[in-house]
Regions:
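Conserved N-terminal beta1-alpha1 strand-loop-helix module at the mouth
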Residues: 1-80
């Protein structure tokens, strides 16, 4: 059995992004992707996506955007 060395784990979704963290004209989903990209480039081990109160289409779109920014990192994506 493989064991993982996971030291950093972040759970979040667009609903966790506060207005003060948004760039001008940025959506909460875009800000989340930006944060995940930054954190994963700095060594984040796991990001757990929680996406409440939204359509399946929006969820899939956001998950795909996050997968794209995680491609060249060692960060794992967990979906809840």
């Amino acid at each position: 059995m493989n064991s993982f060395k996971l030291n950093t784990y972040v759970i979040g979704g667009p609903e966790n992004i506060q207005e003060r963290h948004l760039l001008p004209y940025e959506t909460k989903s875009a800000a989340l992707v930006r944060f995940v990209s930054l954190f994963s480039s700095l060594g984040l081990d796991v990001f757990q996506l929680r996406f409440k109160n939204s359509s399946d289409t929006d969820f899939i779109k956001l998950a795909n955007e996050i997968v794209q920014v995680l491609k060249n990192t060692s960060c794992k994506l967990c979906i809840n």
